[in-house]
């Protein structure tokens, strides 16, 4: 029986990176690996942007991707919500149809 995988994507303020990463690394049972990347947000939603971000026209954010079993997604969201109850952390879930290594 195969495990259903999901990709959990989170966008968070960059200043939350250390706490977010530490929270994920400390989870038990441990999670598979994950990826973080600095990104810039564009468009609407500048109400809480800094003056610097308003002048630049983009908001600095952290992008985090986790591919994990479907059964672990809610556990991750619950733990992060307890450690970082932050209204500017946005998340969504996508199906993973296939995953592997090329070599």
Stretches with model-predicted labels:
Residues 1-103:
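Positively charged, small/polar-rich N-terminal and surface patches that mediate targeting and assembly
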């Amino acid at each position: 029986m195969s495990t259903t995988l999901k990709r959990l994507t989170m966008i968070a303020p960059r200043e939350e990176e250390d706490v977010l990463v530490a929270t994920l690394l400390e989870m038990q049972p441990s999670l598979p690996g994950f990826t973080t990347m600095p990104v810039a947000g564009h468009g609407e939603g500048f109400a809480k942007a800094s003056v610097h971000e308003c002048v630049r026209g983009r908001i600095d954010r952290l992008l985090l991707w986790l591919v994990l079993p479907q059964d672990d997604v809610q556990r991750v969201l619950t733990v992060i919500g307890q450690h970082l109850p932050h209204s500017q952390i946005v998340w969504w879930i996508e199906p993973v149809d296939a995953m592997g290594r090329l070599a």
